[in-house]
UniProtKB/Swiss-Prot annotation:
Binding site for substrate: D89, S90, G91, G92, F93, D143, Q187, G214
Chemical reaction(s) catalysed: 7-aminomethyl-7-carbaguanine + guanosine(34) in tRNA = 7-aminomethyl-7-carbaguanosine(34) in tRNA + guanine
Gene Ontology molecular function: metal ion binding; tRNA-guanosine(34) queuine transglycosylase activity
Active site: D89 (proton acceptor), D264 (nucleophile)
Protein known as: Queuine tRNA-ribosyltransferase
Species name: Shewanella sp. (strain W3-18-1)
HAMAP family cross-referenced by the UniProt entry: Q_tRNA_Tgt (MF_00168)
Pathway assigned in UniProt: tRNA modification; tRNA-queuosine biosynthesis
Length: 374
């Protein structure tokens, strides 16, 4: 992978990630394909929304279908018929989400399979081996996602273990002679000094990109903004910056304003299946009765297949009848909305008009622009 940085507007950055399988324009949003599929979508449909890269889930793909089946197909690209870049998370966050059914030690994590209760052990080395089998273009180190809330001492211990796991991940990645890219993950909770220590340790190990982890796990939005404003300027400028698991459209806007290059989140697809649709004027709840006889499209500013061909009344009808097509059309729209938002942000950075773009984004929804600390 090669990262090119074209221009900046304030802290916001416009560039691209160049892979053998294709180029990813940044800032970029990655749709989430947890089990090797963006729910309800064919790869061609996902690509048509403007997606350059997808995210796959190491933990879930390891449990089902497993490494052996993946290697029989070649890799995850061949298995799911997506011949463009794929980033896979390491499984750390999913293990964190298991709660009481997992035990974290220095060696790794012991837990029971959420599928059949089988005892399983996952460590940095195994995570690297699984992601090698997946053929991930971007591999993430195995880390512990620091919970919120956590005391500073708890966050320090978690972060320092993640640093030790980062070194083990790097060593195993190199031992496997994996030709792809490996990203480090900055931890430290809401504590700036711990974030500094984490980044310093990761840079000493050396990675192809740096992710900010452990945010959007329950902390106030102001804390997320504060940590991003503090840590992003310290990340090496020639490396991509990835904010993991974020988020709402406004979170993408605020992340870009603070120098983030990459995002992922299940929100556009999950919300689509629940009838919550993003538009240039805010969120529409399509199952609300006021849409029952509305012949207008979801968003007159959207060029997606759904908005060009169907009315709000039809989408309301599909939702009320629990038709599969409704979830699919909603997903197409939400994914396209996210990609159009990223296209707009990239264009605004290129032309030096990001402030105006951000102001229009918020005012069109009747909201105030959040303060950005200089």
């Amino acid at each position: 992978m090669k990262f090119e940085l074209d221009t900046t507007d304030g802290r916001a950055r416009r560039g691209r990630l160049i892979f053998d399988r294709g180029t990813v324009e940044t800032p970029a949003f990655m749709p989430v394909g947890t089990y090797g599929t963006v729910k309800g979508m064919t790869p061609e449909e996902v690509r048509a929304t403007g997606a350059d890269i997808l995210l796959g889930n190491t933990f879930h793909l390891w449990l089902r279908p497993g490494e052996e089946i993946m290697r029989k197909h070649g890799d995850l690209h061949d298995f799911m018929n997506w011949q463009r870049p794929i980033l896979t998370d390491s499984g750390g966050f999913q293990v964190f989400s298991l709660g009481d059914i997992r035990k974290i030690t220095e060696e790794g994590v012991h837990f029971r399979s959420p599928i059949n209760g089988e005892k399983i052990f996952l460590d940095p080395e195994k995570s690297m081996q699984i992601q090698d089998a997946l053929g991930s273009d971007v591999v993430m180190i195995f880390d512990e996602c620091t919970p919120y809330p956590a005391t500073e001492d708890e966050a320090r211990k978690s972060m320092q273990m993640s640093l030790r796991w980062a070194k083990r991940s790097r060593d195993e990645f190199d031992r496997l002679k994996n030709p792809n890219s490996l990203f480090g993950i900055i931890q430290g909770g809401v504590y700036e000094d711990l974030r500094d220590e984490s980044l310093k340790g990761l840079v000493e190990i050396g990675f192809d990109g740096y992710a900010v982890g452990g945010l959007a796990v329950g902390e106030p939005k102001a804390d997320m903004h504060r940590i991003l404003e503090h840590i992003c300027p310290q990340i090496p400028a020639d490396k991509p910056r990835y904010l993991m698991g974020v988020g709402k459209p406004e979170d993408l806007v605020e992340g870009v304003r603070r120098g983030v290059d990459m995002f992922d989140c299940v929100m556009p697809t999950r919300n689509a299946r629940n009838g919550h649709l993003f538009t240039s004027e805010g969120v529409i709840k399509i199952r609300n009765a006021r849409h029952r006889d509305d012949t207008s499209p979801l968003d007159t500013k959207c060029d997606c297949y759904t908005c060009k061909n169907y009315s709000r009344a039809y989408l309301y009808h599909l939702d009320r009848c629990n038709e599969i097509l409704g979830a699919r059309l909603n997903t197409i729209h939400n994914l396209r909305y996210y990609q159009m938002l990223m296209e707009g942000l990239r264009g605004a950075i290129e032309t030096g008009t990001l402030d105006a773009f951000v102001a229009d984004f918020y005012t069109s929804q009747g909201r105030e622009v959040p303060e950005l600390v200089d």
